[in-house]
């Protein structure tokens, strides 16, 4: 394609003579470089080349093709007239055109038709000859590049991600030497201005042109910033062509969910050689993540031991993410040796948690008295909805330490005592707990409703290690009228914790002991004696009767 020149094709329609009296010059126009959307001033010079004859009734018609449109309407749209031209005389006609804004780069046709009458005077006689000339001219329109950036991606705070973006030339001209700067601003340095006088067929225009040098300047501390490469060379981009590049971006940790703009600068050279630059932005959607964490686990009492009931466990749930968590629910799942202190006491409805917000909830558990001393991982089930009402469920664990303590079991299942006397009773106990017991002491607790007194009701056993047994002695004085039957008395076991482990607590337990009373004077013994006598009489009578029967035979 030939640029900056006009290609002229002459198509002539000769009606009367093959010799033209008029010369039609190539059109002159402003601006010299035509772009889509421009208004173009067009001048056409007509000269009477016949130095013998006058020409009259000159009509110049312009018929533009796409993308040109006539704007000149006086006196008739697209038509200009010259009344006459003497031999050698010339005149200029003026037209105004508009270029369609979406015209791509190429040469476009303009048809110029000139009709006139030539006056031929010979031998005093005037003869009129009519002529029509059609010429085709091509004006070049330089398209202008324009850019659009597409990137369908989302980012997550505190993360570095590689995302693709597409750069599209949506303009009408080819862009050369295209460069893309990510995380830059456009700083145009004004270098002054210049005045340019443009003349065409005696018409002079003065144009003021500002001179500036576009410069891409990097921006620091961006909420979304490029990592590594920030400048990308794309080469030439024709209209409707595109390039895809991969950006590595870091998203700041303090960003909340929403839309953000990444500044960028794109530079290129248009088809007419003009250097251009544009400040653009890349739209990015930061999708906040939801990170629910459990912290600040506090128990009451602070020291949890086997057999403790109504232990309160306070936990703090925090949304460490960047998006709101909705309808948050917590459920403490208890397994042996733990159980809920009451129904539904360990299901908590927290509600909504905004980013960075915390809430504290309380759970209540009972600890089995035979629980082993160790660390336990109690699961907490967390359910919630995200901003799009999608359901999620996760599980966190809290650490609960059950400390050791002594625990006792009476090995002696029952003792036999005699009514009306003092009975020395040996009671064996075992430390079935997980901690050494110091200063172990047993005591019988007197019950006024029972026929017992305790001349010696207590005895010190000493120290018992876990799984070790010890025996203590008490004396039970049984009332002489006590009935012969089993009784259940209460034995109190008192001890101190393991001082070597810093446990100075005093532990008190009460365990039952079966005491069987034997009383020969009691009504039960009389009844038993009568039954025995009757049984003996019956047996003797039966034997005697059989013996007499045999003697008679």
Swiss-Prot record:
It comes from the Archaea. One of its GO terms (cellular component) is plasma membrane. The keyword Hydrolase does not apply. The chain crosses the membrane at residues 6-26, 524-544. Keywords: Cell membrane, Membrane, Transmembrane, Transmembrane helix. The keyword Transmembrane helix applies. This is Uncharacterized protein MJ1561. To M.jannaschii MJ0795 and MJ1506. Its main location: membrane. It is found in: Cell membrane. It is a multi-pass membrane protein.
């Amino acid at each position: 394609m030939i640029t900056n020149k006009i290609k002229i094709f002459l198509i002539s329609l000769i009606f009367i003579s093959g010799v033209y009296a008029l010369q039609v010059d190539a059109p002159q126009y402003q601006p010299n470089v035509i772009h889509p959307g421009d208004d173009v001033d067009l001048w056409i010079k007509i000269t009477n080349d016949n130095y013998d004859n006058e020409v009259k009734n000159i009509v110049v018609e312009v018929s533009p093709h796409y993308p040109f449109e006539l704007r000149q309407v006086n006196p008739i749209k697209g038509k200009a007239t010259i009344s006459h031209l003497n031999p050698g005389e010339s005149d200029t006609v003026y037209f105004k055109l508009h270029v369609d804004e979406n015209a791509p780069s190429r040469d476009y046709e303009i048809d110029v038709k000139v009709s006139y009458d030539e006056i031929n005077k010979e031998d005093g006689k005037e003869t009129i000859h009519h002529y029509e000339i059609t010429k085709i001219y091509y004006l070049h329109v330089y398209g202008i590049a324009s850019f659009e950036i597409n990137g369908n991606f989302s980012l997550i705070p505190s993360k570095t991600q590689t995302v693709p973006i597409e750069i599209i030339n949506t303009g009408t001209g080819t862009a050369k030497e295209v460069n893309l700067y990510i995380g830059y601003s456009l700083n145009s340095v004004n270098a002054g201005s210049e005045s340019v006088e443009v003349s065409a067929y005696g018409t002079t225009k003065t144009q003021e042109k500002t001179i500036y040098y576009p410069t891409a300047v990097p921006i620091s501390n961006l909420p979304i910033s490029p990592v590594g490469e920030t400048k990308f060379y794309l080469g030439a981009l024709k209209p409707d062509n595109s390039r895809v590049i991969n950006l590595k971006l870091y998203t700041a940790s303090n960003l909340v969910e929403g839309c953000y703009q990444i500044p960028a600068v794109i530079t290129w050279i248009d088809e007419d050689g003009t250097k251009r630059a544009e400040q653009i932005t890349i739209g990015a959607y930061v999708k906040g993540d939801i990170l629910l964490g459990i912290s600040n686990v506090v128990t009451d009492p602070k020291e949890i031991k086997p057999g403790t009931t109504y232990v309160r466990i306070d936990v703090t749930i925090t949304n460490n993410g960047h998006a709101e968590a909705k309808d948050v629910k917590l459920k403490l799942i208890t397994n042996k040796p733990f159980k809920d202190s009451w129904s539904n006491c360990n299901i908590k409805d927290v509600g909504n948690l905004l980013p960075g917000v915390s809430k504290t909830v309380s759970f209540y558990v009972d600890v089995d008295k035979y629980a082993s001393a160790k660390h336990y991982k109690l699961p907490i089930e967390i359910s919630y909805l995200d901003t799009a009402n999608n359901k999620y469920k996760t599980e966190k664990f809290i650490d609960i330490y059950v400390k050791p303590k002594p625990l006792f079991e009476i090995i002696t299942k029952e003792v036999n005592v005699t009514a009306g006397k003092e009975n020395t009773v040996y009671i064996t106990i075992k430390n079935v707990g997980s901690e050494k017991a110091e200063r172990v002491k047993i005591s019988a607790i007197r019950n006024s409703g029972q026929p017992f007194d305790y001349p010696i009701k207590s005895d010190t056993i000493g120290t018992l290690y876990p799984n070790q047994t010890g025996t203590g002695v008490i004396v039970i004085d049984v009332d002489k009228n006590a009935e012969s039957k089993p009784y259940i008395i209460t034995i109190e076991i008192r001890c101190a914790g393991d001082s070597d482990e810093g446990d100075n607590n005093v532990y008190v337990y009460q365990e039952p002991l079966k005491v069987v009373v034997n009383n020969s004077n009691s009504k039960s013994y009389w009844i038993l004696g009568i039954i025995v006598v009757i049984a003996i009489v019956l047996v003797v009578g039966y034997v005697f009767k059989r013996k007499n029967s045999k003697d008679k035979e």
